[in-house]
Amino acid sequence: MTQPIAKRFPTPPIDKLPDDIRSRLLGVQEKSGFVPNVFLTLAYRPDEFRAFFAYHDALMERDSGLTKAEREMIVVATSSANQCHYCVIAHGAILRIRAKNPQISDQIAVNYRKADITPRQRAMLDFAMKVSAEAHKISEQDFTDIAGHGFSDDDVWDIAAISAFFALSNRMANVTGMRPNDEFYMMGRLPK
């Protein structure tokens, strides 16, 4: 039985989307072999789609003091805490690929404190989780602690921004009933 991409809102046909959005979806499909459901679901509101992915790309694709794998660690840990099925599965796949580690995303999703990560990465995730769950409790001590692990002010901004951005993404995925593409489940688990 084929399940809907998202349970609660219609998914527009690709051929009916604005040219720029259709082009982006087809580019993603060409690169990965499928269109991730987040693209199709958010295309329901084209202006918001554009804003969402512009901010996503600014956070997740630029050069910074965080590796692309570390950014995905933040997404997986905070999405797990927010019980976002879509983001844990989709970004877990991306993390496995970027870290070249088939076990890391499962470890982080279940309990990042027991994952095979460095003390620096654990400090990063501790800060990210606090931003995600208790941002109102962030104190100067938190900034001192994370700086002690070699994170710059720009790195700390990135950790906070990724945590905050994916809180939005997690909530929209849950509200829309977005389901992960089947392709994500096996990505990065077996050597090519």
Regions found by a protein language model. Name each.
Residues 1-192:
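Hydrophobic alpha-helical segments
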